[in-house]
Amino acid sequence: MTERERIIKALKREKIEGHVPTFELVFYLTMEVLGKVHPSHRSYHQWNQSSAKEKELQLRDMAFCYTEIAKLYGHGAIFVHPNPNDFENAVRLLRIIRETTGMEYYLCMHGDPTFSIPNGDRMIDFSARIYEDPEGIKTEQEQRLVKMTDFAEKLKKVDNGALLDGFTLCADYCFNVNPFFPPDIFGDLIAPPLAKVIKAYRDMGYYTIKHTDGNIMPIMEHLVQCKPDALHSLDPQGGVDLKLVKQKYGDKICLVGNVNCGLLQTGTDEEAAADIRRALRDGMPGYGFIFSTSNCVYTGLDLGRYNMMNKIWREEGVYK
């Protein structure tokens, strides 16, 4: 069974044997592991000036970063961030990964048309707009949705639809204390386009993983009712209890994540190891679980801590 097939079984909440699947939204520490700048950190201001040979070499080097990290750490999925982010380069990057690894890995890309928490520069203006111009927000999200689903449909026509398995929707909605969008506003402004894009992707044959950090509990019902195949992060720093979420929603949705990034960053080795084991213990029963951090392997994280997490997964994250 390929790693791709194992990820898909987890998304479908089906029984699997061997290791619980694992992957990370992003593994930024490629310089430390491979001696290469992560693809998302590269700047190609003169891309259009480059020769076809130079472009191909750059794309192959990016593909190597993605696939080598997956091989080294046993990841079953690769979240591909095309750079430059256009259709032509996305297709070529995905093709290189498929050419070099076959159908071994579940490949996904970003594809979320909904609004995230605004940054500090936009916070006040956007907050006012929620109340003063909700129809404008809805219209803008619909325009983004059309653009993203057109991209997905176009991609599905390439290589018999074999390049991409799904989309990961990465708009963040929540702070650690509460959602940015109150539940009623979330239900009116955000949930409808979220449900619509998930259905559109599913109708095309794509899987969906919905990511958001923070305290999702006040909007959990909305998220589940939008029917993504999986929910990612399950942020313990936002008070999300994986065991309780599993008990209540584990028959409806695959759960991904929950290893506390805060403890990986600042906790003791003993605290971090205990939390890693807790996530495995709470998430694995009943299947429908993909093991990962509660965010990603971000710039500044101690690689030794992720290596410890991966070692515990290899030794203990196994279905009997």
Predicted regions and their residues:
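Active-site loop segments of alpha/beta catalytic cores
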Residues: 1-65, 76-320
